[in-house]
UniProtKB/Swiss-Prot annotation:
GO cellular component terms attached to this protein's record: cytosolic large ribosomal subunit
Complexes and interactors: Part of the 50S ribosomal subunit.
Protein name: Large ribosomal subunit protein uL1
Role played: Binds directly to 23S rRNA. The L1 stalk is quite mobile in the ribosome, and is involved in E site tRNA release.
Pfam families documented for this protein: Ribosomal_L1
């Protein structure tokens, strides 16, 4: 089905301004999903924040209970010893210090997540211009600077997603694949929303979770009725 036909199919199925129960919203998306690859299911959450204010920017990470459906390659900066061994045991593809930094500077950047122990940041700091633009720079706010690298690796590989408000105060995140069953997608979305609520800035006023929309990789969004979700 051509993308234009897919968009039209969803547009016909969706009533303007209507919010759908989660299961109905997902059904609409899956019915119109005809791509030759397994599409992702994405969510856009409009928050009641002023993203222009530094104290109202929302950033963090969530471990999705049903995972993301993606294979994640992890590199860890940790000094030789217990912490490095812990990271390797958890499944990290690469662990090191200056040697790992040199490999990255030489072009080895085939990683989805880069983690560092606090005492390794002196090495990682030199890679800011390399890792920063790729979204790979370790940051304590999203759990990628950690004194427990083994746990951080396990989280990354078991379905951890990072989120950050854009200029419009919207969070964009993937909550799984179209091949996931509805309950898995729902549990992932609920986990994300609960963590967003926990991360609510103290200065945010009014309705915080203003709008939740789900979409497939190639399709438009369908608004979700939040009362169909368990957010307590």
């Amino acid at each position: 089905m051509a993308q234009s036909k897919r968009v039209k199919a969803i547009a016909v199925a969706v009533a303007p301004g209507k919010a759908y129960a989660f299961e109905d919203a997902i059904k609409i998306l899956k019915t119109a999903t005809k791509a030759k690859f397994v599409e992702s299911i994405d969510v856009a959450v409009r928050l009641g924040v002023d993203a222009k204010k530094s104290d109202q920017q929302v950033r963090g990470s969530t471990v999705l209970p049903a995972g993301t459906g993606k294979s994640v390659r992890v590199a860890v900066f940790a000094p030789a010893g217990a912490k490095a061994d812990e990271a390797l045991a958890a499944g990290a593809e690469a662990v090191g210090m200056d040697d790992l930094a040199e490999k990255m500077q030489a072009g080895d950047l085939s990683y989805d997540v880069v983690i560092a122990t606090p005492d390794a940041m002196r090495v990682v700091g030199k890679l800011g211009t390399l890792l920063g633009p790729r979204g790979l720079m370790p940051n304590p706010k999203v759990g990628t600077v950690s004194a427990n690298p083994g746990e951080a690796v396990k989280n990354a590989k078991s379905g951890q997603v990072r989120y950050r408000t854009d200029k419009a105060g919207i969070i964009h995140c993937t909550i799984g694949k179209a091949s996931f069953d509805d309950e898995a997608l729902k549990s992932n979305l609920q986990a994300l929303l609960l963590d967003l609520v926990k991360a609510k800035p103290a200065t945010s006023k009014g309705t915080y979770l203003q709008k939740v929309s789900v979409s497939s990789t190639m399709g438009p969004g369908v608004t979700v009725d939040q009362s169909s979700l368990s957010l307590k």
